[in-house]
């Protein structure tokens, strides 16, 4: 299949495996959830009754005082421990390499079908000015609230001029992830990035 290059009459032949495969919602959902869970720090911690600082002396005598109680560190008391206290743990989920790559291909294919995938010859700016970068984006005539630009090489000028725009994300091919692709309204790829993506996924 061929992708039209924005601002040119030329087309770019691309692999059907990457940009023309059937969309698998279940696979994409599985990979996105696993990716987000793996990014969790998992440092939540609470103190159980054995970890709370306080005396373990019986608070009152056994008989004649109503409900029977022991230590004041029990979860029922204010200042006591937490029942079933949370402990630090890993939320990471294993995803097979084939699954991950298939999900990325599936996302690219669906973006292409929906007209949310654009290809440009190159995307670079000569000066580190946000205004110049914004004008370049405007010339692409993309419609959407969030824009992801994937380039084979990111110059210092491109990085500096784009970082002040809240709804624009500039990444290299190596920094691509399924969450960034799914969360973007429009994805712009350079020709060099397309070739690197095909080398990675095919």
Swiss-Prot record:
Compositional bias annotation for Polar residues: 42-52
Family matches, as InterPro entries: Ribosomal_uL4, Ribosomal_uL4-like, Ribosomal_uL4_dom_sf
Keyword Cell inner membrane: no
Start and end residues of each stretch annotated as Disordered: 42-70
GO molecular function ontology, one term from the record: structural constituent of ribosome
Listed GO biological process terms: translation
GO cellular component: ribonucleoprotein complex; ribosome
Source taxon at top rank: Bacteria
Pfam families, per database record: Ribosomal_L4
Keywords: Ribonucleoprotein, Ribosomal protein, RNA-binding, rRNA-binding
Keyword Chaperone attached: no
PANTHER family given in the database record: 50S RIBOSOMAL PROTEIN L4, LARGE RIBOSOMAL SUBUNIT PROTEIN UL4M
Known partners and oligomeric status: Part of the 50S ribosomal subunit.
Role this protein plays: One of the primary rRNA binding proteins, this protein initially binds near the 5'-end of the 23S rRNA. It is important during the early stages of 50S assembly. It makes multiple contacts with different domains of the 23S rRNA in the assembled 50S subunit and ribosome.
Family: Belongs to the universal ribosomal protein uL4 family.
Protein's UniProt name: Large ribosomal subunit protein uL4
Source organism: Xylella fastidiosa (strain Temecula1 / ATCC 700964)
Higher taxonomy: Bacteria, Pseudomonadati, Pseudomonadota, Gammaproteobacteria, Lysobacterales
């Amino acid at each position: 299949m061929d992708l039209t290059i924005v601002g040119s009459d030329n087309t770019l032949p691309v692999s059907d495996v990457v940009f023309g495969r059937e969309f698998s919602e279940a696979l994409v959902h599985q990979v996105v959830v696993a990716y987000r869970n793996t990014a969790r720090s998992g440092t939540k911690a609470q103190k159980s009754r054995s970890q709370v600082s306080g005396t373990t002396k019986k608070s009152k005598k056994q008989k004649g005082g109503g409900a029977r109680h022991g230590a004041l560190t029990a979860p029922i008391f204010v200042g006591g421990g937490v029942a079933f206290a949370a402990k630090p743990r890993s939320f990471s989920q294993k995803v097979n390499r084939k699954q991950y790559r298939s999900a990325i291909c599936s996302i690219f294919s669906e973006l292409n079908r929906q007209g949310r995938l654009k290809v440009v010859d190159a995307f670079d700016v000569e000066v580190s000015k946000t205004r110049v970068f914004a004008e370049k984006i405007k010339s692409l005539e993309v419609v959407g609230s969030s824009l992801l630009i994937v380039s084979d090489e990111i110059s210092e000028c491109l990085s500096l001029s784009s970082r002040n725009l809240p709804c624009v994300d500039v990444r290299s091919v190596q920094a691509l992830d399924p969450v960034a692709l799914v969360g973007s309204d429009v994805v712009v790829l350079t020709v060099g990035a397309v070739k690197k993506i095909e080398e990675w996924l095919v």
